[in-house]
């Protein structure tokens, strides 16, 4: 599972689409929101949304960063002309939010809503279930008043209908249940509305943050609608990261790549999101964090061709610049449940063969550790490859802990028993 943030605009559109249905008609949200971008101006938005010129407006950037009000990046109770000027003055400009600098490019526009009560609700996925947070004193100071937040826990395979919500009044209780069911059915991993208000059973989310499980895209894309997973604020993808991102979006498998240090000596080709964390953390724990070149994973039984393209991208990056100390490639993973190890290894082997000379020139040492369906065949292919390439390849099965193979790779080791 990869948790990925979505724009407030898209999250509010999802809420507007499903709140009435999931609350059995008790609540609704009209979803009056517009997204202004460099390609879609406020004038164009006003043509498609008549309310923009008929009501006071709220405007704020919609680029996956918070505390916009505290950074002076929220315009309230504005006329159309004021909103237009405010956006014009900020579009394409660099701002600093905390320690991060980035360019403003997307602005959320919605009706300004005068209100008396502000509520807070958040739902997040944890290892053993989902946790719900609620307070009837929401707003920008929620963190300073955290002792007033009520918490409820829904275990895995549990139902929110079985949870004791008697601490909430009946109206709020029904809303919490409806929102939680949307959260589960549409594969949210995090959803925070702070604040929201309720006016005559219309729920008005004034500020919303959401993340989705992107591996659910193929069965939820129709429910999600025309959403996107934006680049985190201030983050610019390299050409290679963009390529893997596009490849990931076209497949039912999961392919992720983040370049940490293109001149690093330690490179990872890891199967599985959980395993990728273990391998990367172990590299750092052993004192090689500054040498870690990349972070990422392939999982969900990718095809041989997809694995080849992924591996080729990593190997190409690794062999662009030589290091007199040589380089280390760890091809790892846990014990797969359904990914065909031999099939994915064939894709990696194809890429390694293609870069045979560059691997030698860069003095690359390769360490392999894998288990799962057809892993013995996959490991056999890897052993044979080492002889063919003239590149040292140490091959290990699931009998060797993941952390141990990293230690061997970074501090030297052989697999003479195999």
For each predicted feature, which ranges?
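ATP-dependent carboxylate/acyl-activation modules
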Residues: 2-192, 197-327, 353-357, 371, ...
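Short, glycine-/small-residue-enriched flexible loop/hinge segments at domain edges that mediate gating
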Residues: 323-337
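Glycine/threonine-rich flexible loop motifs
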Residues: 338-343
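Charged helix-capping and loop-helix junction motifs
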Residues: 344-350
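Short internal beta-strands
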Residues: 362-370
């Amino acid at each position: 599972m990869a948790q990925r943030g979505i724009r407030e605009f898209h999250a509010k559109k999802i809420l507007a689409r499903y709140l009435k249905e999931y609350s059995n008609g008790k609540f609704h949200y009209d979803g009056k929101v517009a997204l202004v971008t460099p390609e879609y101006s406020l004038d164009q938005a006003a043509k498609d949304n008549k309310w923009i010129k008929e009501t006071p407006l709220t405007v704020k950037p919609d680029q996956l960063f918070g505390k916009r009000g505290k950074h002076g990046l929220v315009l309230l109770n504005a006329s159309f002309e004021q909103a237009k000027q405010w956006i014009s003055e900020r579009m394409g400009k660099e701002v600093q939010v905390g320690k991060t600098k980035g360019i403003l490019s997307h602005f959320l526009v919605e009706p300004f809503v005068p209100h008396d009560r502000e509520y807070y609700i958040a739902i997040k996925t944890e290892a053993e279930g989902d946790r719900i947070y609620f307070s009837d004193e929401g707003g920008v100071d929620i963190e300073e008043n955290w002792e007033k937040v009520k918490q409820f826990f829904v275990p895995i395979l549990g139902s929110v209908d079985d949870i004791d919500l008697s601490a909430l009044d009946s109206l709020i209780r029904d809303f919490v249940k409806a929102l939680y069911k949307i959260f589960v059915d549409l594969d949210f991993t995090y959803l925070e509305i702070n604040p929201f208000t309720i006016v005559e059973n219309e729920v008005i989310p004034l500020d919303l943050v959401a993340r989705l499980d992107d591996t659910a895209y193929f069965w939820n894309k129709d429910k999600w609608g025309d959403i996107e997973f934006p680049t985190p604020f201030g983050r610019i993808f390299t050409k290679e990261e963009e390529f893997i991102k596009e490849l990931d979006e076209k497949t039912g498998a999961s392919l992720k790549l983040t370049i940490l240090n293109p001149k690093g000596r330690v490179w990872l080709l890891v199967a599985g999101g959980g395993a990728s964390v273990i391998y990367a953390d172990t590299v750092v724990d052993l004192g090689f964090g500054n040498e870690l070149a990349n972070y990422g994973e392939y999982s969900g039984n990718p095809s041989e061709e997809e694995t080849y393209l992924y591996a080729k991208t990593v190997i190409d990056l690794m062999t662009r610049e030589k290091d007199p100390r040589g380089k280390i490639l760890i091809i790892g993973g846990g014990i797969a449940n359904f990914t065909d190890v031999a099939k994915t290894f064939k894709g990696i082997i194809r890429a390694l063969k293609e870069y045979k000379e560059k691997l030698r020139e860069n003095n690359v040492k390769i360490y392999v550790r894998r288990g799962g369906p057809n892993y013995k065949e996959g490991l056999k292919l890897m052993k044979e490859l080492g002889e063919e390439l003239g590149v040292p390849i140490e091959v290990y099965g699931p009998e060797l802990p993941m952390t141990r193979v990293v230690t061997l790779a970074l501090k030297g080791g052989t697999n003479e028993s195999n």
